[in-house]
Amino acid sequence: MLLIKNGRVMDPKSGLDQVCDVLVQDGKIIKIAPEITEEGAETIDATGHVVAPGLVDIHVHFREPGQTHKEDIHTGALAAAAGGFTTVVMMANTSPTISDVETLQAVLQSAAKEKINVKTVATITKNFNGKNLTDFKALLEAGAVGFSDDGIPLESSKIVKEAMEEAKKLNTFISLHEEDPGLNGVLGFNENIAREHFHICGATGVAEYAMMARDVMIAYATKAHVHIQHLSKEESVKVVEFAQGLGAEVTAEVAPQHFSKTEALLLTQGSNAKMNPPLRLESDRRAVIEGLKSGVITVIATDHAPHHVDEKNVEDITKAPSGMTGLETSLSLGLTYLVEAGELSLMELLEKMTYNPAKLYNFEAGYLAENGPADITIFDAKADRLVDSHFASKAANSPFIGETLKGQVKYTICKGQIVYQA
């Protein structure tokens, strides 16, 4: 038995927000009450700390199989636990891609060894070829939770429509990375800073929002659910809002880096601030925050994208891979740039990091209730934390190293077991 005493228990599903005790047994929460005494229980004193549902991240890259010099499922799970996450959804851009049942089963076998809940999508098209759909039905039956070709946009509108129709038939959805290659230059650099500082053609806004406009309208026509990944532009928020207004089933996520920083970070942090989609303008940063506030964007997801230090530290920054490690800074960025900044309440932040992402996939997660799962994060919301280069992840490609942020994870509990302790 595990007894958590005197914490501020916050549950976005029920709205519970009060100081009370939580008793855990056999992987479940068995009691939540103002005062619990339990002889012989292991006790955590959570005085002054928030007791929240375990965080849920629906967009991570754990690089297994094929790229385990960057990360693997084990180190990814350790990074997740250190960041307060108890459930994650891996993307399928591995080598080989997760496009068939055999590869999926091998990945899920590896994931099952971890102490947190590690789930995965499968690809929409075979080996990311953009032309032939995978066997959605067989992959779902084998344990895939959804479908995404994340990392590679789907150029064929015919394939997008077919994928949506198939997903709808099977009561699932597809998640899309929206950057039209035909409208883009060098990825990872927003068009403004690319032109003015790096003297190259960069990643344009229109490449994101034009492709997104196409896809949300196909979703509208097919009555299928589409999930937009890591949107970054002011116009993209408007596109999602427009589609939702028409009655289309469109959901969207934003990554913490896009509500925290702008393209200027490239000048101080170099390749660690290079990502797809790129960091944009202050007007875009403000717009995605407004999208979170209005409910147009319902999910915060990290796009945790670890890379080896040698890959990032190349002489020509345009040759460096895009992406940043994100699991261990996500909560702190939300607390710093949304809650402390007065943009969202703590409960609203938690909703977008727990209940909403869990609900999207119908996971039994993201809430605190008696008889519910004992997936719990305990953190100090007010503590200052200097981000250093020591991560549980294999990778340290974070542009936030050296910055002081709010919030410190104290304990992560998954299935009733302490999986991380600061």
Swiss-Prot record:
Where Zn(2+) 2 binds, per the record, is at D150, H177, H230
Known pathway: Pyrimidine metabolism; UMP biosynthesis via de novo pathway; (S)-dihydroorotate from bicarbonate: step 3/3
Provide the GO biological process annotations.
Answer: 'de novo' UMP biosynthetic process; purine nucleobase catabolic process
**Got a GO cellular component term for this one?**
cytoplasm
Residues where substrate binds:
H61, F62, R63, N93, N276, H307
Please give the function described in this protein's UniProt entry.
Catalyzes the reversible cyclization of carbamoyl aspartate to dihydroorotate.
Question: Could you tell me which PANTHER family the record lists for this protein?
Answer: ALLANTOINASE (PTHR43668:SF2)
- In Swiss-Prot or TrEMBL terms, this protein is called Dihydroorotase
Which species does the entry assign this protein to? Streptococcus pneumoniae (strain ATCC BAA-255 / R6)
